[in-house]
């Protein structure tokens, strides 16, 4: 197969998740909510062997697959919602781009030709396109993405309908005390390409849309693209002033009680099928892991 895997590596199977949770409990880990995490940081409690589960965007498999498993094991978790993906007003372009690259040996993007015959070339092409897209300003972002998808006969809205939850799923989940919803912006823009006002508008609009649906205040936020390339001091300071209790990035790392002063740039650890509990054991001393 010529399928490439950047997006596939960001998810795990239901079987793996169920087994992983069982193994965590067998090894003495406590699975806590984002609110418990913040309380522990604030009180400087001993936080050895504690795990927080977080999920981004609002994928349908969060509802269909992950939720029943979390419910079965009584595990709290947080979903950072992007309303634009939930209401189908924007595209999850990263999945569409991967499909286009997988199915073609040569592609054109923004008037440039990229060869992608081998698996290595396809993987490289994905990261090249991703890098180019994340450097587009707000006015170019969807224009160039949508043009690329149309040129390749991709119906992104149809694809999104199969990938993401609907508001009815969100409302149902919000009635369960195990579930906390956070915000992930309205349109999933890379925030470092927006002005301060545009960032604030993106975040506040997302909050309002989610709060209107679930009738609860949104207190937590995840950057839509959260590496050191997209999130720096400027973006962190803006979010720090918007009243969130916590803000998470995708920078790799565990959480210490010292993060009390850095609650608006918390690191996380990506859970993959290759993740082993022993890896936590090597780095868990006096830390909380967010997954």
Predicted regions and their residues:
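Acidic (Asp/Glu)-rich catalytic clusters
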Residues: 25, 69-73, 165-183, 256-260
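Generic alpha-helical structural signal
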Residues: 18, 64, 127, 142, ...
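C-terminal active-site subregion of NodB/CE4 polysaccharide deacetylases
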Residues: 1-54, 61, 92, 98-99, ...
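Extended, charge-rich helix/loop segments that form flexible
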Residues: 89-176
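Electropositive, surface-exposed helix/loop patches at the edges of structured domains
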Residues: 64-69, 73-76, 113-132, 280-291
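Structural detector of well-ordered beta-strand residues that form the stable sheet scaffold
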Residues: 78-80, 181-182, 245-248
